């Protein structure tokens, strides 16, 4: 069996003993049914990975001995801040999971005129917690040792107005530029992905006022979740660490 990778939310140190957090303990003790003497890999978001060994396990708690740690940097040289207008149901979860596997550094859920998601503050907070857990699970699976933050949801214009020294991109079906025509080098990108119905004309004009560049991904119309992953992949191939 592949050695499980587990995220620990507190800083780790070599040659220490810790108790895993509740979610991790449930996964190791109840789902995988692992026991004393079995090996784990732990990471705490600091770009380090630690070998570890289970010392005790029950259905409710798992304690481990942390062994040696080492730096294991798998982050892309391209910092991508994804601004994703929220989509319904599992589409947003899928976008978050796959974007993190592809190396996105930061994700901000957005509200726009045509956003199909209407949540009160309590439900939205629960969604944010759920999305952050999805981000952690994606890092555990793909080998990243830093966990990207899922920021609190924002209004589209407030996000566009934030100061950012990087390249600002907006996907537009009638744009004249493509990712391949963007000048090199690029180290930071703020990538805007609109809702299923697209941005309104006023919103597109607003992004231009904040110096966003419209880009075209190709001749076909893509769903919002496909658009995000296609754009991230193309950016990583041209400016990052794919290909």
From Swiss-Prot:
Keyword annotations of the record: Cytoplasm, Methyltransferase, rRNA processing, S-adenosyl-L-methionine, Transferase
InterPro entries: Alpha/beta_knot_MTases, PUA-like_sf, RsmE, RsmE_MTase_dom, RsmE_PUA-like, tRNA_m1G_MTases_N
Main location: cytoplasm
GO MF term list: protein homodimerization activity; rRNA (uridine-N3-)-methyltransferase activity
pH dependence: Optimum pH is 7-9.
Top-level taxon: Bacteria
Quaternary data: Homodimer.
PANTHER family hit by this protein: 16S RRNA (URACIL(1498)-N(3))-METHYLTRANSFERASE (PTHR30027:SF3), RIBOSOMAL RNA SMALL SUBUNIT METHYLTRANSFERASE E (PTHR30027)
This protein's name: Ribosomal RNA small subunit methyltransferase E
Gene from which the chain derives: rsmE
